[in-house]
Amino acid sequence: MSDKVYTVQDYKSGQPRWCPGCGDHAFLNSLHKAMAELGVAPHNIAVISGIGCSSRLPYYVNTYGFHTIHGRAAAVATGAKVANPDLTIWPISGDGDGLAIGGNHFIHAVRRNIDLNMILLNNRIYGLTKGQYSPTSERGFVSKSSPYGTVEDPFHPAELAFGARGRFFARCIAVDGAASVEVLKAAANHKGASVVEVLQNCVIFNDGTHASVATKEGRAKNAIYLEHGKPMLFGENKEFGLMQEGFGLKVVKLGENGITEKDILIHDAHCQDNTLQLKLALMEGPDFPIALGVIREVEAPTYNDAVAEQIEEVKGKKKYHNFQELLMTNDTWEVK
């Protein structure tokens, strides 16, 4: 963190070229605010993207950035972090870019636990290429590439992250700026691979895809904000809660059948066993609320630290410590 106090303006760059009403606008505002509150100097940040609407984001942040090729944000970010561990790196991908052609890089970056703030902007559609179904589009979704409806099940980003032994998973919705800022800050402060799924709208090709939680009123009824150490309550007046039932979960109403707040599950984001956390991450309407906030956050050694330690260990055992020293051994000649 820098001694200088930064403002949102320090992180802004250029005029975003997205459709009016695109969820990318709201997310970008949250990212600017999160960066300002984190206080990391712009020259110590790199924003790295692949290809897609959301992948234009590096142009609109006044930091270092790479607009790479399709699906390769996590791969390039891995190299950048290992080469310069002091950088704060934000790989940003859409659901198509990150989970289709980039899916392999995504799961291995998570598995290796590289210290990256991995953002997945999920609007369940390919937007830049004008409306084809993506790996997160729902079964039966009608699009230009599935005119009669898709006949395949979608990926759940949480399931991929958890399956790759992810240590941090959080979810927010782009239009909820205050909550998004807090989630982004938590991701940045976590040491290791942080995966944040951002639910966002595509007003042109998949309008209303997250309609149930798109408004404040909708989120009160259909979403639950999880906070570590606090009871899992939701509803306009926090009148509903989550309890365990067998190996699953159930929604209960406080006051009915003698149920009180003491009966409600307490969220433990730091539990090493991810069984309950994954159940929370996979909840869907209409039977369950959609989980928002930090769902899982546990500590583990990072890949970039392990690589740096290994290099120092090997150098300590070798006569020559770098390539230049090796070149200058024995007889040398200077050609003029």
Predicted regions, residues:
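Short coil/turn connectors at secondary-structure junctions
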Residues: 14, 41-45, 83-89, 111-117, ...
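Thiamine diphosphate
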Residues: 51-127
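ATP/pyrophosphate-binding catalytic subdomain of soluble kinases
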Residues: 168-225
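Conserved thiamine diphosphate
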Residues: 86, 134-187
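Active-site diphosphate/adenylate-binding microenvironment
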Residues: 5-69
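Glycine-rich beta-alpha junction loops
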Residues: 51-53, 123-125, 176, 199-204, ...
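Flexible, low-complexity linker and terminal segments
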Residues: 2-4, 13-14, 204-336
